[in-house]
Amino acid sequence: MIKKIFLFFFSLLLISSCVKKRDLSTNTVVAHILSQPDGLHPYNNNSVMRSYIFSYTQKTLLGLDLESLDYYPRLITELPTSSEDNKTFFFELRDDVKWDDGEQVTGKDVVFSAKIMLCHLTNNSQIRPIYNSVIKSVKLDPNNPLKFSMTAQDINWTAKTILGGIYIQQKSYWDPNGLFDNISFEQILDRSFEETDELSDWFNDFNHADNGYKPENLKGLGPYYVSEWEPSQYVTLTRKENWWG
């Protein structure tokens, strides 16, 4: 089992102590980072340290090569193709991507993730405009659960890749009752859906700080999971034994 421990850089004494006590016979990597993340909520936090840890615990449809600055397919089979008017883009998920419980990732997870990212009831006002200014809708292919398309509101140079930046979340975990199935993207974007008590309760739960701090609530498609978080001291990531990648 491989572990990564991220120590928050508060004092040299603390770091020295931790390193000396570390058992070098185990597959453990210790990394020193300057501060703890503001949280590890899939959508509501937005610090650099969060993004760093998410590079191990979460996955997006597309990845960005930091040397060439070119996008590459991560959860999808190839880069999206586009319609003639460059407003609709077509994706196909890899068939080997699975959640930790063994469930296959499908277009339903992508549609759900996009709806939550765009919804004004999600506490992500710092990044939501990046997405709801471009994305008009995400639609499932009726003949293939791994295929879906995204339509942009207008021709935009970020339209082809914008959906690829959302951390994909498991619909069956977050929305087992299909609460969002009958809420359209149009209703979400113009805020015309009915805010029922059930929906308000769902967002109160989803936005709760526990979903950014408690290890058991931090779900993702990455090769590691958060096994321990000691506030202001360290975060421990443990390698998944049966990761799909």
Task: Cite the ranges covered by each PLM segment.
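Sec-dependent N-terminal signal peptides
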Residues: 5-13
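C-terminal motif of bacterial Sec signal peptides marking the signal peptidase cleavage site
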Residues: 16-17
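Short, well-ordered beta-strand elements
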Residues: 26-35, 88-91, 113, 148, ...
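N-terminal lobe/hinge region of extracytoplasmic solute-binding protein
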Residues: 32-84, 115, 219
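Short, solvent-exposed loop/turn elements at domain surfaces
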Residues: 37-44, 69-72, 100, 158-161, ...
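Aromatic- and charge-enriched surface segment that lines or borders ligand/interaction sites
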Residues: 78-124, 149
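Surface-exposed binding/hinge segments that line
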Residues: 129-201
